[in-house]
Protein backbone atom coordinates (compact mmCIF):
# COMPACT_ATOMS: atom_id res chain seq x y z
CA UNK A 1 0.00 0.00 0.00
CA UNK A 2 1.39 3.26 -0.92
CA UNK A 3 0.56 6.54 0.74
CA UNK A 4 0.95 9.94 -0.66
CA UNK A 5 1.53 13.22 1.05
CA UNK A 6 -1.57 15.37 1.24
CA UNK A 7 -1.48 18.09 -1.27
CA UNK A 8 -0.90 21.58 0.08
CA UNK A 9 -4.17 23.47 0.19
CA UNK A 10 -3.71 27.01 -0.89
CA UNK A 11 -5.41 29.58 1.36
CA UNK A 12 -7.64 31.95 -0.49
CA UNK A 13 -5.93 35.24 -1.11
CA UNK A 14 -7.74 38.11 0.65
CA UNK A 15 -8.15 41.03 -1.58
CA UNK A 16 -7.18 44.32 -0.08
CA UNK A 17 -9.91 46.90 -0.03
CA UNK A 18 -9.31 49.74 -2.39
CA UNK A 19 -7.60 52.67 -0.74
CA UNK A 20 -10.47 55.02 -1.54
CA UNK A 21 -12.84 52.88 0.52
CA UNK A 22 -10.57 53.03 3.55
CA UNK A 23 -10.34 56.78 3.20
CA UNK A 24 -14.12 57.09 2.79
CA UNK A 25 -14.70 55.02 5.94
CA UNK A 26 -12.39 57.27 7.95
CA UNK A 27 -14.08 60.38 6.58
CA UNK A 28 -17.54 59.05 7.48
CA UNK A 29 -16.45 58.11 11.02
CA UNK A 30 -14.83 61.53 11.46
CA UNK A 31 -17.98 63.28 10.24
CA UNK A 32 -20.15 61.26 12.64
CA UNK A 33 -17.87 62.21 15.53
CA UNK A 34 -17.98 65.88 14.51
CA UNK A 35 -21.78 65.83 14.24
CA UNK A 36 -22.04 64.29 17.72
CA UNK A 37 -19.68 66.94 19.11
CA UNK A 38 -21.72 69.68 17.42
CA UNK A 39 -25.07 68.35 18.62
CA UNK A 40 -24.03 67.58 22.17
CA UNK A 41 -21.42 70.27 22.70
CA UNK A 42 -20.65 73.18 20.41
CA UNK A 43 -24.17 74.27 19.35
CA UNK A 44 -25.81 73.98 22.81
CA UNK A 45 -22.83 75.58 24.54
CA UNK A 46 -22.72 78.44 22.03
CA UNK A 47 -26.45 79.13 22.40
CA UNK A 48 -26.16 78.97 26.19
CA UNK A 49 -23.26 81.44 26.11
CA UNK A 50 -25.36 83.80 23.96
CA UNK A 51 -28.35 83.63 26.32
CA UNK A 52 -26.46 83.90 29.61
CA UNK A 53 -24.30 86.77 28.33
CA UNK A 54 -27.25 88.70 26.87
CA UNK A 55 -27.32 92.45 27.33
CA UNK A 56 -29.15 95.42 25.86
CA UNK A 57 -29.22 95.18 22.08
CA UNK A 58 -27.39 97.88 20.06
CA UNK A 59 -30.57 99.54 18.74
CA UNK A 60 -31.76 100.07 22.32
CA UNK A 61 -28.38 101.31 23.57
CA UNK A 62 -28.77 104.32 21.30
CA UNK A 63 -32.03 105.44 22.91
CA UNK A 64 -31.77 108.54 25.11
CA UNK A 65 -35.32 109.19 26.35
CA UNK A 66 -35.88 109.65 30.07
CA UNK A 67 -39.04 110.57 32.00
CA UNK A 68 -37.95 114.21 31.58
CA UNK A 69 -38.40 113.80 27.81
CA UNK A 70 -42.12 113.48 28.56
CA UNK A 71 -42.17 116.31 31.10
CA UNK A 72 -42.08 114.03 34.16
CA UNK A 73 -39.60 114.69 36.97
CA UNK A 74 -37.48 111.78 38.18
CA UNK A 75 -34.27 110.92 39.98
CA UNK A 76 -31.51 108.44 39.21
CA UNK A 77 -31.24 105.62 41.74
CA UNK A 78 -29.03 102.62 42.49
CA UNK A 79 -29.53 99.63 44.75
CA UNK A 80 -28.02 96.19 45.20
CA UNK A 81 -29.52 92.72 44.90
CA UNK A 82 -29.15 90.01 47.53
CA UNK A 83 -26.53 88.30 45.35
CA UNK A 84 -24.47 91.48 45.00
CA UNK A 85 -25.48 92.88 41.60
CA UNK A 86 -25.67 96.67 41.25
CA UNK A 87 -28.96 97.82 39.69
CA UNK A 88 -29.45 101.26 38.11
CA UNK A 89 -32.81 102.88 37.56
CA UNK A 90 -35.15 105.86 37.71
CA UNK A 91 -37.69 106.77 40.34
CA UNK A 92 -40.82 108.85 39.78
CA UNK A 93 -42.63 109.46 43.10
CA UNK A 94 -46.32 108.63 43.29
CA UNK A 95 -48.79 111.49 43.54
CA UNK A 96 -52.36 110.77 44.60
CA UNK A 97 -52.53 107.00 43.97
CA UNK A 98 -50.18 105.94 46.81
CA UNK A 99 -48.98 103.11 44.60
CA UNK A 100 -45.52 102.65 43.07
CA UNK A 101 -45.08 100.31 40.12
CA UNK A 102 -41.79 98.46 39.57
CA UNK A 103 -41.16 98.00 35.82
CA UNK A 104 -39.10 95.01 34.62
CA UNK A 105 -38.10 94.82 30.94
CA UNK A 106 -37.46 91.85 28.66
CA UNK A 107 -34.33 90.11 27.39
CA UNK A 108 -31.97 92.26 25.26
CA UNK A 109 -33.87 95.42 26.20
CA UNK A 110 -33.55 98.15 28.87
CA UNK A 111 -35.69 100.22 31.24
CA UNK A 112 -36.77 102.28 28.22
CA UNK A 113 -38.84 99.38 26.86
CA UNK A 114 -41.56 100.19 29.40
CA UNK A 115 -41.01 103.94 29.61
CA UNK A 116 -44.01 105.14 27.57
CA UNK A 117 -46.57 103.02 29.40
CA UNK A 118 -44.96 104.01 32.70
CA UNK A 119 -45.37 107.68 31.76
CA UNK A 120 -49.03 107.08 30.88
CA UNK A 121 -49.61 105.61 34.35
CA UNK A 122 -47.52 108.32 36.06
CA UNK A 123 -49.85 110.92 34.56
CA UNK A 124 -52.69 109.10 36.31
CA UNK A 125 -50.89 109.51 39.65
CA UNK A 126 -48.95 106.24 39.99
CA UNK A 127 -45.30 106.21 40.97
CA UNK A 128 -42.70 104.39 38.87
CA UNK A 129 -39.44 102.59 39.50
CA UNK A 130 -37.88 101.62 36.19
CA UNK A 131 -34.57 99.77 36.22
CA UNK A 132 -32.12 97.95 33.97
CA UNK A 133 -32.08 94.24 34.67
CA UNK A 134 -28.77 92.58 35.55
CA UNK A 135 -26.28 92.60 32.68
CA UNK A 136 -28.45 95.10 30.79
CA UNK A 137 -28.23 98.86 30.34
CA UNK A 138 -26.31 100.59 33.13
CA UNK A 139 -26.67 97.81 35.70
CA UNK A 140 -23.89 95.51 36.88
CA UNK A 141 -22.59 92.41 35.14
CA UNK A 142 -24.06 89.00 35.91
CA UNK A 143 -25.10 85.87 34.06
CA UNK A 144 -28.62 86.04 32.61
CA UNK A 145 -31.07 83.28 33.56
CA UNK A 146 -34.23 84.20 31.58
CA UNK A 147 -36.05 85.35 34.70
CA UNK A 148 -35.03 83.16 37.63
CA UNK A 149 -32.08 85.13 39.00
CA UNK A 150 -33.72 88.29 37.66
CA UNK A 151 -36.42 87.82 40.31
CA UNK A 152 -33.74 89.04 42.75
CA UNK A 153 -33.66 92.36 40.86
CA UNK A 154 -37.41 92.79 41.42
CA UNK A 155 -37.11 91.84 45.09
CA UNK A 156 -34.25 94.32 45.50
CA UNK A 157 -36.37 97.10 43.96
CA UNK A 158 -39.19 96.38 46.41
CA UNK A 159 -36.70 96.29 49.29
CA UNK A 160 -35.25 99.63 48.16
CA UNK A 161 -38.69 101.23 48.32
CA UNK A 162 -39.50 99.76 51.73
CA UNK A 163 -36.17 99.81 53.57
CA UNK A 164 -34.23 102.70 52.04
CA UNK A 165 -37.01 105.10 51.10
CA UNK A 166 -39.39 103.92 53.86
CA UNK A 167 -42.20 104.17 51.34
CA UNK A 168 -45.69 103.31 52.53
CA UNK A 169 -46.98 103.06 48.96
CA UNK A 170 -48.46 99.81 47.77
CA UNK A 171 -45.98 98.07 45.47
CA UNK A 172 -46.95 96.56 42.13
CA UNK A 173 -44.54 94.47 40.03
CA UNK A 174 -45.09 95.03 36.30
CA UNK A 175 -43.00 93.07 33.82
CA UNK A 176 -42.89 92.13 30.17
CA UNK A 177 -41.59 88.81 28.80
CA UNK A 178 -38.55 87.87 30.92
CA UNK A 179 -39.42 90.78 33.21
CA UNK A 180 -42.96 89.44 33.71
CA UNK A 181 -41.49 86.06 34.60
CA UNK A 182 -39.17 87.70 37.13
CA UNK A 183 -42.07 89.72 38.59
CA UNK A 184 -44.21 86.63 39.18
CA UNK A 185 -41.33 84.63 40.66
CA UNK A 186 -40.46 87.55 42.96
CA UNK A 187 -44.04 88.08 44.10
CA UNK A 188 -44.20 84.42 45.10
CA UNK A 189 -41.28 85.05 47.48
CA UNK A 190 -41.97 88.47 48.97
CA UNK A 191 -45.21 89.74 50.53
CA UNK A 192 -44.05 93.34 49.90
CA UNK A 193 -45.50 93.05 46.39
CA UNK A 194 -49.24 93.72 46.60
CA UNK A 195 -50.15 92.95 42.97
CA UNK A 196 -48.57 91.87 39.68
CA UNK A 197 -49.07 92.90 36.05
CA UNK A 198 -47.68 90.15 33.82
CA UNK A 199 -47.37 90.95 30.12
CA UNK A 200 -46.27 87.96 27.99
CA UNK A 201 -44.69 85.91 30.77
CA UNK A 202 -42.95 82.59 30.20
CA UNK A 203 -44.52 79.39 31.52
CA UNK A 204 -41.44 77.58 32.82
CA UNK A 205 -37.74 77.25 32.05
CA UNK A 206 -38.12 73.95 30.17
CA UNK A 207 -41.10 75.12 28.14
CA UNK A 208 -39.48 78.45 27.22
CA UNK A 209 -36.23 76.94 25.96
CA UNK A 210 -37.93 74.10 24.07
CA UNK A 211 -40.53 76.41 22.52
CA UNK A 212 -38.03 79.01 21.29
CA UNK A 213 -35.61 76.35 20.02
CA UNK A 214 -38.30 74.88 17.77
CA UNK A 215 -39.88 78.22 16.82
CA UNK A 216 -36.74 80.10 15.75
CA UNK A 217 -34.08 77.49 14.99
CA UNK A 218 -36.21 74.43 14.16
CA UNK A 219 -33.86 72.33 16.26
CA UNK A 220 -34.89 69.20 18.20
CA UNK A 221 -35.42 69.21 21.94
CA UNK A 222 -33.30 66.05 22.06
CA UNK A 223 -30.40 66.26 22.17
CA UNK A 224 -29.82 69.98 21.60
CA UNK A 225 -32.57 71.30 23.88
CA UNK A 226 -31.56 69.12 26.79
CA UNK A 227 -27.91 70.07 26.46
CA UNK A 228 -28.79 73.75 26.03
CA UNK A 229 -30.83 73.75 29.25
CA UNK A 230 -27.98 72.04 31.08
CA UNK A 231 -25.43 74.62 29.92
CA UNK A 232 -27.70 77.60 30.70
CA UNK A 233 -28.28 76.32 34.23
CA UNK A 234 -24.57 75.61 34.72
CA UNK A 235 -23.45 79.01 33.47
CA UNK A 236 -26.11 81.03 35.31
CA UNK A 237 -26.02 78.78 38.39
CA UNK A 238 -29.67 78.04 39.02
CA UNK A 239 -31.93 75.01 39.23
CA UNK A 240 -34.33 74.91 36.29
CA UNK A 241 -36.73 72.69 38.24
CA UNK A 242 -37.43 75.67 40.54
CA UNK A 243 -38.10 77.93 37.54
CA UNK A 244 -41.83 77.17 37.41
CA UNK A 245 -44.08 80.17 36.82
CA UNK A 246 -47.30 78.18 37.19
CA UNK A 247 -46.21 77.19 40.67
CA UNK A 248 -45.25 80.81 41.44
CA UNK A 249 -48.73 82.00 40.43
CA UNK A 250 -50.26 79.48 42.84
CA UNK A 251 -47.94 80.64 45.64
CA UNK A 252 -48.92 84.28 45.10
CA UNK A 253 -52.28 83.20 46.48
CA UNK A 254 -55.09 85.72 46.65
CA UNK A 255 -53.01 88.75 45.64
CA UNK A 256 -54.33 90.29 42.39
CA UNK A 257 -52.60 89.48 39.09
CA UNK A 258 -53.35 90.85 35.64
CA UNK A 259 -52.20 88.63 32.75
CA UNK A 260 -51.74 90.26 29.34
CA UNK A 261 -51.03 88.84 25.88
CA UNK A 262 -50.93 90.20 22.34
CA UNK A 263 -53.58 88.35 20.34
CA UNK A 264 -51.27 86.80 17.73
CA UNK A 265 -47.96 86.62 19.59
CA UNK A 266 -46.29 83.37 18.49
CA UNK A 267 -43.51 83.50 21.07
CA UNK A 268 -45.81 83.71 24.10
CA UNK A 269 -49.30 83.17 22.70
CA UNK A 270 -52.50 83.96 24.61
CA UNK A 271 -52.83 80.29 25.54
CA UNK A 272 -49.91 80.69 27.94
CA UNK A 273 -51.49 83.70 29.63
CA UNK A 274 -54.70 81.66 29.86
CA UNK A 275 -52.86 78.78 31.58
CA UNK A 276 -51.32 81.16 34.09
CA UNK A 277 -54.68 82.84 34.67
CA UNK A 278 -56.33 79.48 35.33
CA UNK A 279 -53.59 78.59 37.83
CA UNK A 280 -54.26 81.74 39.87
CA UNK A 281 -56.32 81.76 43.05
CA UNK A 282 -57.10 85.46 43.41
CA UNK A 283 -60.73 86.45 42.81
CA UNK A 284 -59.31 89.76 41.54
CA UNK A 285 -57.14 88.26 38.80
CA UNK A 286 -57.80 89.41 35.23
CA UNK A 287 -56.87 88.35 31.71
CA UNK A 288 -56.44 90.83 28.84
CA UNK A 289 -55.80 89.72 25.25
CA UNK A 290 -55.11 92.80 23.10
CA UNK A 291 -55.94 92.97 19.40
CA UNK A 292 -54.77 95.64 17.01
CA UNK A 293 -51.95 96.59 14.61
CA UNK A 294 -48.78 94.72 15.54
CA UNK A 295 -50.50 92.22 17.81
CA UNK A 296 -48.40 89.46 16.21
CA UNK A 297 -45.21 90.92 17.72
CA UNK A 298 -44.05 89.53 21.05
CA UNK A 299 -45.10 91.73 23.96
CA UNK A 300 -46.75 94.38 21.77
CA UNK A 301 -50.11 94.54 23.50
CA UNK A 302 -49.48 98.17 24.44
CA UNK A 303 -48.46 99.13 20.90
CA UNK A 304 -51.51 97.35 19.44
CA UNK A 305 -53.99 99.42 21.45
CA UNK A 306 -52.38 101.82 23.95
CA UNK A 307 -55.65 103.46 25.02
CA UNK A 308 -57.35 100.18 25.90
CA UNK A 309 -54.17 98.86 27.51
CA UNK A 310 -53.78 101.78 29.93
CA UNK A 311 -57.50 102.02 30.68
CA UNK A 312 -57.63 98.34 31.62
CA UNK A 313 -54.48 98.62 33.75
CA UNK A 314 -55.84 101.64 35.61
CA UNK A 315 -59.16 99.88 36.17
CA UNK A 316 -57.38 96.75 37.42
CA UNK A 317 -55.20 98.70 39.84
CA UNK A 318 -58.12 100.68 41.24
CA UNK A 319 -60.09 97.48 41.77
CA UNK A 320 -57.15 95.43 43.05
CA UNK A 321 -55.73 98.08 45.38
CA UNK A 322 -58.65 100.14 46.70
Regions found by a protein language model. Name each.
Residues 120-140:
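Conserved alpha/beta-hydrolase
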Residues 33-80:
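An N-terminal hydrophobic leader/cap segment in hydrolases
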Residues 113, 144-165:
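Alpha/beta-hydrolase active-site loop
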Residues 274-322:
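C-terminal catalytic histidine-bearing segment of alpha/beta-hydrolase fold enzymes
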Residues 107-120, 133:
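The serine-hydrolase catalytic nucleophile loop
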Residues 252-253, 258-261, 265:
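Short beta-strand/loop motif that positions the catalytic acidic residue
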Residues 185-238:
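Hydrolase active-site cap/lid region
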Residues 266-272:
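Conserved alpha/beta-hydrolase "acid-adjacent" motif
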